[in-house]
């Protein structure tokens, strides 16, 4: 087998990468055969596949690294791994990023949430910046990129955090609250983020309503959204089996 490309190499060739969110080697096989160029190992779908429960924080880092090693070893295309909040404070998260890169992750997503999360709050900005700085340092010298995901609830605060996280060393940012915006307004929100947050961006969970996509790749690619996730693999598999 030829060496798989890094995400940086894929981004140099593709303006916008549509990436299915996979959960095992079979879902990777299906995505590869469909011609996708990169993938995301979904924390939610991996939890459902391995444990049969929703994404409620029941996966631990050892289980994630075990799965990452096997799935990335099988895959012939790069995979970004959802590492939740890094499974601990800054130094722990940094060490876990290093371990995931060694296990084959082409990218690692770290969300700015605390270890104990009640009500969806995020870490204080200064603490989150410190965590991303530590994770970026841990990934230096590897081909693994750092994706900073913010779960704050307002667009203006999300933009502020994306700029700060990028300055701390994150290669890519992800604003999850785009999913909470009415579908007809999501493109304008994506544009507003891009005005201040320059660089690689991840558009979360591309969806459709009434048969029409909320946004198109052609619309968002010029604004720096070069990675777009889609959560359909597990749902498609369940539908086919039932």
Protein language model features and the residues they cover:
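Active-site beta-alpha connecting loops in nucleotide-dependent enzymes
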Residues: 209
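Structured C-terminal subdomain patch of bacterial secreted/periplasmic proteins
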Residues: 234-242
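Alpha/beta enzyme core
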Residues: 2-203, 212-230, 236
């Amino acid at each position: 087998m030829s060496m798989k490309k890094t995400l940086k190499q894929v981004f140099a060739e593709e303006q916008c990468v549509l990436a299915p969110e996979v959960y095992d080697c079979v879902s990777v096989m299906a995505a590869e055969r469909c011609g996708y160029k990169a993938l995301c190992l979904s924390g939610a779908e991996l939890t459902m596949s391995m444990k049969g429960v929703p994404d409620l924080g029941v996966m631990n880092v050892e289980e994630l690294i075990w799965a990452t090693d096997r799935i990335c070893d099988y895959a012939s295309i790069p995979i970004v791994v959802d590492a939740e909040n890094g499974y601990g404070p800054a130094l722990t998260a940094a060490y876990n990023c290093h371990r995931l890169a060694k296990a084959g992750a082409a990218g690692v997503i770290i969300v700015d949430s605390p270890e104990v999360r009640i009500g969806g709050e995020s870490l204080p900005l200064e603490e989150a910046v410190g965590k991303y700085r530590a994770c970026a340092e841990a990934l230096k010298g590897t081909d693994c990129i750092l994706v900073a995901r913010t779960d704050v609830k307002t667009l203006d605060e999300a933009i502020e955090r994306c700029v700060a996280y990028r300055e701390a060393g994150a290669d890519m940012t992800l604003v999850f609250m785009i999913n909470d915006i009415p579908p007809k307004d999501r493109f304008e929100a994506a544009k507003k983020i891009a005005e201040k947050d320059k660089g690689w961006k991840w558009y979360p969970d591309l969806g459709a309503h009434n048969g029409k996509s909320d946004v198109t790749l052609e619309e968002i690619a010029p604004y720096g959204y070069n990675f777009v996730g889609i959560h359909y693999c597990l749902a498609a598999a369940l539908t086919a089996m039932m």
